[in-house]
Amino acid sequence: MPALSTGSGNDTGLYELLVALPAQLQPHVDSQEDLTFLWDVFGEKSLHSLVKIHEKLHYYEKQNPVPILQGAAALADDLAEELQNKPLNSEIRELLKLLSKPNVKALLSVHDTVAQKNYDPVLPPMPDDIDNEEDSVKIIRLVKNREPLGATIKKDEQTGAIVVARIMRGGAADRSGLIHVGDELREVNGIPVEDKRPEEIIQILAQSQGAITFKIIPSIKEETPSKEGKMFIKALFDYDPNEDKAIPCKEAGLSFKKGDILQIMSQDDATWWQAKHEGDANPRAGLIPSKHFQERRLALRRPEILVQPLKVSSRKSSGFRRSFRLSRKDKKTNKSMYECKRSDQYDTADVPTYEEVTPYRRQTNEKYRLVVLVGPVGVGLNELKRKLLISDTQHYGVTVPHTTRPRRSQESDGVEYIFISKHLFETDVQNNKFIEYGEYKNNYYGTSIDSVRSVLAKNKVCLLDVQPHTVKHLRTLEFKPFVIFIKPPSIERLRETRKNAKIISSRDDQGAAKPFTEDDFQEMIKSAQIMESQYGHLFDKTIVNDDLAVAFNELKTTFDKLETDTHWVPVSWLHS
């Protein structure tokens, strides 16, 4: 490996070395996993800050600065007193004014504290009323300012004692290292709490500002330091602790929205995890329901929260056929003729809670991620797809569908369709080689997995639109799909913007384009709501197609970022 240049000729170039390392090491790293790890490690902001601090300290160690005296504040007071007895001129007045300023006095006081190495806090004297036969008692004084204490308490059912139930990571109690789970609380600011309810004690703590003094009996059980590595999860549901009757302390809860990335700080409690929002500078963690607990209570409520399955009417079946439209040149075949075999209803087996994720950025030598487009019939998904293809035919591609119908004279195999026998089609169906398939007039039509691979192998972005239930089957290490939901605007905007537009209808055998009706708008809105409710946790991006040009620009910008930016993907995609 060639020598690395730090950009400086002395030993203070550690920071420059840290910045240069990832790019220098990239040609020598074989696996994507190792490269991602190196970028994460050397790109950590906290590490950069520590290195800068190290360099500053290293510099001052060489200078070996030592305080000239340990009583600068007293000396300044003496000087001011002496100057008062001298004839006052403008310079003396200015100096006296400076020495009398509170910030200058505070600076000199801090200087003396550092010079005298007087860092330990002054604890209050030990109370005289402690029984000699009583258990060991600790007197703890914490300064919490306006932040929460960062601990929860409960009443022990057997002894009736008030004990610490949980220490919140990053809170005042956690940072102090003096309070632990299981410690028995006896007094708060001199107020006995043995006969009080936890709610009353919480009120005392809430009303206390600045320093708080605790009298506690330490827990016999020693806590083992947590060795958990960094774990990030994507929330697949909305959560508001104020609406959760099961949470032990609503004030300690952490609210989040579907799609938020959370860093898990502790899983010590099987029911309530501690987490914080990724990238949040606030170190304090909050409580969230654990994966197992959330799955269990959602499963119990499931019969009540299930929505009606989305029935595939003759009109809605055209949504299945969208995967074929842009692959064919014969406009006469553009009619709703497919009955989707795998979209009779939404799959309700999964209980979405959390998904463990990790940062991922596509490398230049990697295949593009599969782009999956989802949306209700009539929302404009096909037009957006068509505009994308026209914008760059060398960069975007679509699949060629398979069919068992006879080839027509003007058609070429592999262009409009891939023509195969009925027996081979049915065999491929049994072997799960089709993403979706349907039947019309005794002929099969379908989109195969190999057709997706073919587009990706040409170093193109494959645009695939499918029914939403199919998305979860595509979420694999091979495809790493990015799922975009094209959502309709409000029904008022639909009436305003689509009044002159037309939709392909399947109510007659000709599949003629007819103007939108009020029923079409209602079906579009209802279908979108069900899709979002049942499969919204699988969508990476939602674009509202209110204005086609605006929606297209947003879609194009999303694709550009997808190819260059870092995104959160399931851990299984990188560590399978």
Curated annotation (Swiss-Prot):
Residues 289-383 are annotated as: Phospho-regulated basic and hydrophobic (PRBH) motif. PROSITE patterns: GUANYLATE_KINASE_1, GUANYLATE_KINASE_2, L27, PDZ, SH3. It is found in: Membrane; Lateral cell membrane; Cell junction, Tight junction; Cell junction, Adherens junction. Residues 139-220 form the PDZ domain. It is a peripheral membrane protein. Phosphorylated by aPKC which promotes dissociation from the cell cortex. The modification Phosphoserine is found at S409. GO terms for biological process: protein localization to adherens junction. Residues 368-560 form the Guanylate kinase-like domain. One of its GO terms (cellular component) is cell-cell junction. It comes from the Eukaryota. Keywords: Cell junction, Cell membrane, Cytoplasm, Membrane, Phosphoprotein, Repeat, SH3 domain, Tight junction. Residues 10-64, 65-122 form the L27 domain. Residues 228-298 form the SH3 domain. Pfam families: Guanylate_kin, L27, PDZ, SH3_2. Heterodimer; able to heterodimerize via its C-terminal L27 domain with LIN7A, LIN7B and LIN7C. Forms a tripartite complex composed of DLG1, MPP7 and LIN7 (LIN7A or LIN7C). Interacts with DLG1 via its N-terminal L27 domain. Interacts with PALS1 and PATJ. The phospho-regulated basic and hydrophobic (PRBH) motif is sufficient and important for interaction with phospholipids permitting cortical localization. Phosphorylation of the PRBH motif by aPKC inhibits the association of the protein with the cortical membrane. Acts as an important adapter that promotes epithelial cell polarity and tight junction formation via its interaction with DLG1. Involved in the assembly of protein complexes at sites of cell-cell contact. Belongs to the MAGUK family. This is MAGUK p55 subfamily member 7.
